[in-house]
Amino acid sequence: MIGRISGLLLEKNPPQILVDAHGVGYELEVPMSTFYGLPATGTQVSLHTHLAIREDGHFLYGFATDEERTAFRQLLKVSGIGARTALAVLSGLSVSDLAQAVALQEAGRLVKIPGIGKKTAERLLLELRDKLGKALPQVAGARLAAVAGGAPDAKSDILNALLALGYNEKEALGAMKGLAEDTGVSDGIRQALKLLSKA
């Protein structure tokens, strides 16, 4: 498995790029979120990668952050979602926006992405609901905390956020036991996710 590539950025032809790593030129497909952050050609670049081996060839995908790659891998686990669609999703939404859309079940945000219809969006939300929050707890928790930050009942918001991330009520309440009464939503979600990730 090729997990990371560092080398000279030779070509940029969205969504493909060519990276020279020690004399070997690697073709990678990247989401537009990564593409727009790339340096100029002729300079060094380092990307997290995912290698897909299929009957019709080997395909390498590059990502600016490990969170993007993790989200890509979770998207590939959704039935009927291939690499092209997964790249389209990450090109249309940041990882934190995707985490929020999944947690709050916002199909409307997904159908705005080219190639994503209503049924596909609903399937994505359903199948990712129990996976994305656990795969990316810090991103999802921080995003939900930002959304719920102004709500008056912090404990209720923390519980709802954890349930939206795919944890059951018993797990969520167990993680909330040690929280102080005056804990804010943002800190509460962060502390609870920390405990749940160790469980």
UniProtKB/Swiss-Prot annotation:
A Pfam cross-reference name: RuvA_N
Region (Domain III): 154-199
One biological process term in Gene Ontology: DNA recombination
Disulfide bond sites: none
Region (Flexible linker) location: 144-154
Function: The RuvA-RuvB-RuvC complex processes Holliday junction (HJ) DNA during genetic recombination and DNA repair, while the RuvA-RuvB complex plays an important role in the rescue of blocked DNA replication forks via replication fork reversal (RFR). RuvA specifically binds to HJ cruciform DNA, conferring on it an open structure. The RuvB hexamer acts as an ATP-dependent pump, pulling dsDNA into and through the RuvAB complex. HJ branch migration allows RuvC to scan DNA until it finds its consensus sequence, where it cleaves and resolves the cruciform DNA.
Name this protein carries in UniProt: Holliday junction branch migration complex subunit RuvA
Provenance organism: Azoarcus sp. (strain BH72)
UniProt gene name: ruvA
